[in-house]
Every structure is written in structure tokens, then in C-alpha cells.
Amino acid sequence: MGKLFGTDGVRGVANKELTGELAYKLGRAGGYYLTRDYKGGKKPVVLIGKDTRISGDMLEAGLVAGLTSAGIDVIKLGIIPTPGVSFLTSSLDVQGGVMISASHNPIADNGIKFFNQKGYKLTDEMEDEIENLIFNKLETIPYPTHEKIGVVDSAPEYYHKYVDYLKETVDSDFSGLKIVVDCANGAAYKVAPEVLKKLRADVMVINGSSDGHKINVNCGSTNPEILRQKVIDEKADLGIAHDGDADRVIMVDERGQVVDGDKIMAICALDMMERGVLNKNTLVTTPYSNLALKEIMEEKGGQVVITKNGDRYVLKEMLENGYNLGGEKSGHIIFLDYNNTGDGVLTALQVVNIVKRTGHKLSELAAVLKPWPQRLANIKVKYKQKLKTSELIKQEISKAEQLLGTEGRVFVRASGTEPVIRLMLEGKDEKRLLELEKKLGSIIEEELN
């Protein structure tokens, strides 16, 4: 990866690392890259969506200036989930899409990610080409004049097309189900409640503000505590928690217990296998998924393929090998039959559909997965790049792996979007995991600070 793009687009503190000027350059270079082979009679068109962060307007203005200066027309979608941009990009006659969001990150952060004409996130190689344009060839991009300059249109109503499509992905109506939805004060604030209501669910919304000052603050998929209590207090059938841009989902059963991405994947994969619609009886996951998921899939006659961490790598594996379900423990789940990226709202609908169709409570469905004990730590460091070269850390990881043997594993990686090292330990002996977490965490902290 280059200097700008991380594992999920360009991220940084808005107006510090991610400025209006950089947004302009990304608009020019990214727009030119996406449309340079366009041969249509009209000007090329790119969609822009955003989450609720207050910095979204500033970055949108920079992107619009960059895109239009490269001769590209822009349609502004307003506040819409990331997967909504992916869906609309693939279904409308446009040449690309851009989403302004930092997903589950803090309010001060923001990000920019691109989608190609088919609604797929760009590959590492494509992003490297855009970086090369920005750093070395920005002035070679043409500056059209007169009527060839791009123009801007606003179409916030296009989100209805996305809502209507989501509704068509399920075959039940949800009447009789009481559902609490935590929109994380983010991009799902309209879409998630609206589609559930159209499916006749009894919907209660929490954290549904769009003012941009509270996105992800003590709410959403990374902080489900308020949702858990609300589900219990309201005697709801289940709860749904999205993150800031609604590309992920975590659920809560009727008892207030969290149903994470692994359990959601288990529920959906086994249901799809039973109905004969899980391609090659295969689920694609990442190293963070619990080994119990592999265990249950194999027990039921399926298999799990593990790829690099990050939903783009899950998608790559799915596209290359014809799989149609994959995702991450965090709740990024891709149903390739329906959308080309992780979609939190769509995923929630598939699970609720299974609840309705089978008549089982969510707790009963989730009980199929009995996770091995796991320890997760996010260790803040100054020099995460040194992880690859530290011999001491490598030695300690090797010792931990030998200690756990076949009944556990160790996974350590540098975050692609934050200054942290992610440490995961998994095994059947929880006491041993805790001891190893303390020891490894301490060594990583000392070595990389």
C-alpha cells in the first residue's frame, strides 16, 4: 500500500491529515482514473455519498471541485450508507462512486473511498495508480474548458431506490416482530428504520440523529450496551446495531445477548446450505473469526476459507472462486447475490427473515455457534511499522503458538486505519490466554513505543 490509502480508502483526522486540498486531489486523480477509458457521448458521471460527520460537507466540496475540474459530472446523494453508494453505482448509468466516511472511527476522523462502475471497492493496485497520479502526474490530468467542465446535481431522493431494493431481498414480511434499531447517529438513520417499517415490523429507533455531532459516540455496532438494555426493557424480539456508515451490523437477541458477525455468518451460512443456495457450501472469513465457525461448518458438511483481514480481501476471494457469502467477525458481511460490498442493513434483513421464516428466536439460532474463548487487545503504539522487523516480538509469538499447540492460535497485525497493533489469542484454556495476552501485550507496547 502507498502513502495515502489504507485498508479501507483514505482515512485521517479531518482538516489535519485529510484536508479539503487532499479531497480535491483525490477527486481529480480518482475521477480521472475511473473515467479515463469512458467512451460515451456524454460526460462521465460519478456519485458521491457521505455519512453524518460535520466534516463531510468540506470534503464533499473538495471532491466535487476535483471531479468537475476533470470534466466529470457529479450527483450528490447526501447522507446514505456506504453500501447504498455501491448499489446505486452498479445499478445506474454512472462511471464510479465515492463515499465520504470513516465508518466506526471517532467523530474527528473522516475518510474517502472509491467504487468502480460495478460498485466494487478498488484493489490495492488501482489505489496505487491513483496515488501515483497525485504525487507524480497530477498536472498531466486535462483541465477541460467551456461546456466540458463537469456540473453538479443533487439527488438525495435516490436513497429510496436503495430502500426498495433492500426490501426485495427478503421473502417474508416482519409483522409481529418488535425490533430496536441503533443507527449510531450515522448514515443508516433513514434507510434502516424505513425498510423495516415497509416490511411491517414494529420499529423503535435509538441514536437516530443526523446532526453529525454524535456519530458512533457510545452507540452503534462497537458499543451495543444501550441497545442491549433497550431490547430487554422494551421486551423486543431483537436489536440491530449499525456503525457510522452502515456497512456492518451487530445484533442483539431477545435476552440482550450480543450476536456478533461470526454468529450472524453461522446463522446465514447454515440456512443457505439447508436451502441449497450457498455456493460450493463455502463461507469466506478472516483470521479474526472464531475457530468454532470452521468447526460447525465442517460438521454440517460445509467448509470455511480464510483470507487476509479486511472485507476487500474477503470480496476478492469470493469473486475469484465463485463464493457468495463471506465476512468478518466485526459484522462486515457480504451477500454477493445482492450487493458488491459489506452491507449492514441488508445483512440484518437476512437474519430477521430467517427468524420470521423459521419461527425460531434469535437466541435459538445463535446457539448453533459455541465460540472458543478469545482475547482481543488493541495496543496503542507510535511505530506500528516496526512490527515486521522486531525479532523479540516474533520470538514471543512463536513461543505462544507452541504453548497453545493445536488447541489455539495467535494473530498479531498492525491496523490499516489506526495507530494500534491488534492482538488476538484463541484457545480452549481461557486462563492461559489471559496470561499470554498480558505478556505479549506488554512486549509489543515496550518494543513499538
Curated annotation (Swiss-Prot):
It is an enzyme of class 5 (isomerase). The keyword Metal-binding applies. It catalyses: alpha-D-glucosamine 1-phosphate = D-glucosamine 6-phosphate. Keywords: Isomerase, Magnesium, Metal-binding, Phosphoprotein. Activated by phosphorylation. It comes from Halothermothrix orenii (strain H 168 / OCM 544 / DSM 9562). Belongs to the phosphohexose mutase family. Mg(2+) binds at S103, D243, D245, D247. GO terms for biological process: carbohydrate metabolic process; peptidoglycan biosynthetic process; UDP-N-acetylglucosamine biosynthetic process. GO terms for molecular function: magnesium ion binding; phosphoglucosamine mutase activity; phosphomannomutase activity. This is Phosphoglucosamine mutase.
